[in-house]
UniProtKB/Swiss-Prot annotation:
GO MF entries: UDP-glucose 4-epimerase activity
UniProtKB keywords: Carbohydrate metabolism, Exopolysaccharide synthesis, Galactose metabolism, Isomerase, NAD, Plasmid
Keyword Membrane attached: no
Domain of life from the UniProt record: Bacteria
Active-site residue numbers: 149
Name of the encoding gene: exoB
Cofactor(s), by name: NAD(+)
Record has Phosphoprotein as a keyword: no
EC number, UniProt record: 5.1.3.2
Native species: Azospirillum brasilense
Protein name from the UniProt record: UDP-glucose 4-epimerase
Length: 348
């Protein structure tokens, strides 16, 4: 670390040992942007964090810890990933989600105000839309979440808006669609032991690390009868976060935008692409629809391109699948898989 880097303001990344947080830390490091991360490592992986990034092991629910880190590392902006993200779990453990995702975000925003930090990039979700009336889903679509996970994220969005109106805090809220894939250089990826994301689950089934892939519903009103989702490569998502940070550091105002490509792929398309990439057959079974699964979830993606100048580099489905499969194969050679998709600075 150079003296100049040590003296530069840092961006605080919460949950930097998790799936998305670690990719963003690598993107920041690649761009020469100093960062520090807080993660309690309850689900994140220490080795996913770039060597140049200081790790403070702890819980973002601690106001004292946040105050100290923001002061000691001269933090001027925050990227907030830490939290709980499993939709079915949120239904059976709703209060855990309101604590980890909403109450801890309140603690974080309070620390920002005390430290005079007025720039926040927030990891939100398309789950705030609930069951959309039409696709593609634009940012002005109704927000009617149908599970505590989506509701907990929407509450944090509202806190950011209110803090902006009252205190001048500026934020970029990024609503993710279906994040998938892994760092093309193999530095990090999704290492969740019990995965629920389709592409990761399909790769694990292909490699014999879990039972055959269950395809839920083949009678949807889609071209091949299976659900369609907008899959975005995690490295493109990480680049969007860097652009959002630079926008705020240039004095830009608050933004709300979807993170997706504006086009979707069906479950059958994902499976077929994985088979083409691997040259092997994915073991799969067919099951009834899952309650609450919309036929299509596709982002309206014009705003992020227009307002941040975001240009995806990894938007081919075969590239997303290939990077995910390569990462899964690398995990076969390692011991233990303690990772998290969204970060783990506070997680039940």
């Amino acid at each position: 670390m150079t003296d100049q880097t040590a003296a530069s303001p840092r961006v605080l990344v919460t949950g930097g040992a998790g799936y998305i947080g670690s990719h963003v830390l690598h993107a920041l490091t690649d761009a020469g942007i100093p960062a520090v991360t807080i993660d309690d490592l309850s689900a994140g992986r220490r080795e996913a964090i770039p060597a140049a990034v200081p790790l403070v092991e702890g819980d973002i629910g601690s106001a004292e810890l946040l105050d100290r880190v923001m002061r000691d590392h001269r933090v001027d902006a925050v990227m907030h990933f830490a939290g709980s993200i499993v939709v079915p779990e949120s239904v059976v453990k709703p209060l855990d989600y309101y604590r980890n995702n909403t109450a801890n975000s309140l603690t974080l925003l309070g620390a920002c105000l005390r430290a005079g930090i007025d720039k926040v990039v927030f990891s939100s979700t398309a789950a705030v839309y609930g069951a959309p009336e039409s696709v593609p889903i634009r940012e002005d679509a109704p927000t009617v979440p149908i599970n505590p996970y989506g509701a907990s994220k929407l509450m944090t969005e509202q806190m950011l808006r209110d803090a902006g109106a009252a205190h001048g805090l500026r934020s970029v809220i990024l609503r993710y669609f279906n994040v998938a894939g892994a760092d093309p250089a193999g530095r990090t990826g999704q290492a969740t032991p019990v995965a629920t994301h389709l592409i990761k689950v399909a790769c694990q089934a292909l490699l014999g690390r879990r039972p055959p892939l269950a395809i839920f519903g083949t009678d949807y009103d889609t071209p091949d009868g299976t659900c369609i989702r907008d899959y975005i490569h995690v490295s493109d998502l990480a680049d969007a976060h860097v652009l959002a940070l630079l926008h705020l550091r240039r004095g830009g105002g608050s933004l709300l935008m979807n993170c997706g490509y504006g086009r979707g792929a069906s479950v059958r398309e994902v499976v077929r692409t994985l088979e083409e990439v691997s040259g092997e057959q994915v073991p799969a079974t067919f099951a009834d629809r899952r309650p609450g699964d919309p036929p299509q979830l596709v982002a309206g993606a014009d705003r992020i391109r227009e307002q941040l100048g975001w240009v995806p580099k990894h938007d081919r489905l075969d590239g997303i699948v290939r990077s995910a499969l390569s990462w899964e194969r690398s995990l076969e050679q390692s011991v233990g898989q303690a990772g998290a998709p969204g970060g783990s600075a506070s997680r039940s």
